[in-house]
Design a protein with these regions (language model features):
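A polyanion-binding, active-site-adjacent surface
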Residues: 1-142
């Protein structure tokens, strides 16, 4: 879901989490716009930056699915539990979704930590970096 800065600018990942995501993308030789398309599960900001309610996700889900259908990415990377849960239909902890390649409408999908979680808890950074190294390797091969 968009945060305060994203809501103001009308673009995903423009705040602190977005800056961190840009650094991670640069580290794996990727960049926004050129070969990375970023979108949110929720298209509007929940009050007080809370997690989206299931009813809110349901209202926006068809837009997300249409974006994916139009873009036809080589790989979908779900950033965070909400994105993973929405795309996979699994109600489990993020750590249970990581390190496995799923399929979403025939497109490989991986789940990793949301950059905001990395800002809140640096203990997740090594695992997230492993995820992004896997992403780099996958994209180099495909």
């Amino acid at each position: 879901a968009p945060g305060e800065q994203e809501d103001i600018h009308g673009e995903p990942f423009v705040g602190r989490a977005g800056k961190l995501l840009d650094k991670i993308l640069t580290a794996i030789d990727r960049s926004r716009g050129d070969d990375v398309y970023i979108c949110n599960v929720l298209k509007c900001r929940p009050p007080n930056n809370r997690d989206p309610l299931p009813s809110e996700v349901e209202q926006c889900e068809s837009y997300l699915h249409m974006q994916i259908k139009l873009i036809q990415p080589k790989l979908i990377v779900a950033l965070g539990r909400v994105a993973g849960k929405t795309l996979l239909g699994l109600d489990v902890q993020l750590k249970e979704m990581r390190n496995e390649t799923y399929e979403y409408t025939g497109i490989p999908l991986r789940v990793t930590y949301h950059p905001a979680a990395l800002l809140r808890n640096s203990n997740f950074k090594a695992a997230a970096w492993d995820d992004f190294k896997w992403i780099r390797s996958f994209l180099e091969k495909n």
